[in-house]
Amino acid sequence: MQLIIINTLLGIFSSNLLCTIYTQTGDWSLYLTSCIIALYEIISYISYNQFIKKTHKNIINCFNGFKIGLIYGLYLDAFKLGS
């Protein structure tokens, strides 16, 4: 449980890092968005696949926590920019 919380917080930190560094110039927005969506879909596929989940449950839950933190952090940054 502690690893999932740490990975969620690491995902929030990573999203803040991605939003401030790579979008500074505006050139990386398309590539960064494509990589984030691909990473999100790969982690979702792995975490909801029953065969893989039975064998590596703890590692997959950690990656899923990172994914949740990343998306939540991006949502928070968008909310800050919108207000």
Swiss-Prot record:
Where in the cell does this protein reside? Plastid, Chloroplast
Q: Which organism is it from?
A: Galdieria sulphuraria (Red alga)
Write down the InterPro entries for this protein, in alphabetical order. Uncharacterised_Ycf20
What gene does this protein come from?
Answer: ycf20
Q: Which UniProt keywords apply?
A: Chloroplast, Plastid
Q: What is the lineage of its organism?
A: Eukaryota, Rhodophyta, Bangiophyceae, Galdieriales, Galdieriaceae
Q: What intrachain disulfides are recorded?
A: none
**Family per record:** Belongs to the ycf20 family.
Q: What else is known?
A: Although originally identified as Cyanidium caldarium, these sequences derive from Galdieria sulphuraria.
Q: What is its main location?
A: plastid
Instruction: Write the signal peptide boundaries.
Output: none
The protein here is known as: Uncharacterized protein ycf20
One cellular component (GO) term of this entry: chloroplast
